[in-house]
Amino acid sequence: MLYPICIEKVSDGYVVSVPDVPGCFSAGDTLSEAMLNAKEAISFHIEGMLEEGEELPKSNPIEQYINQPEYKDFIVTVVDVDLSHLMGKAEKINITVPALLLHRIDQFIATHPEYKNRSNFLSQLATNRLLSA
């Protein structure tokens, strides 16, 4: 799931806010560390929200934050947060897919190792689509 983050340079590093996840903040000494810590903070924060019975926060397009005056001096980017471990137990289903589409999915997965297999690919796409709708 892609979440926009807003990174502010401060005297001793970077501070990260996550506008789509209320109350979620992070920091780091370097930009890379700040982004990595933001991914972890988002995952932990959302896990806590779900445990409290709250809804999974919707991710807005990055464009919503790029031109906002409050983020004028910030680096605005996105981080990809794997929330699959929060979705519950996987259930096996059977689906029908046109042969050409299945072939294209397989080709795509072969060149994108972040998608482990067809099921993972389809699950991630469905999750991203439903949570950003």
Residue ranges, per PLM feature:
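N-terminal segment of the canonical double-stranded RNA-binding domain
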Residues: 1-12, 17
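Short, charged, surface-exposed hinge/linker loops at domain edges
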Residues: 2, 43-96, 100-108, 119-120, ...
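Short aromatic/hydrophobic contact patches that present stacked aromatics
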Residues: 15, 25, 94
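Short glycine-enriched loop/turn motifs at secondary-structure junctions
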Residues: 18-21, 87-89
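A short, exposed loop/beta-hairpin motif centered on an aromatic-Gly-Thr core
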Residues: 22-32
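A short, charged, amphipathic alpha-helix used as a generic interaction element across diverse proteins
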Residues: 30-47
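Acidic/histidine-enriched, beta-strand-rich ligand/metal-binding domains
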Residues: 34, 115, 122-123
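Short helix-capping/hinge SLiMs at alpha-helix to coil transitions
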Residues: 111-113
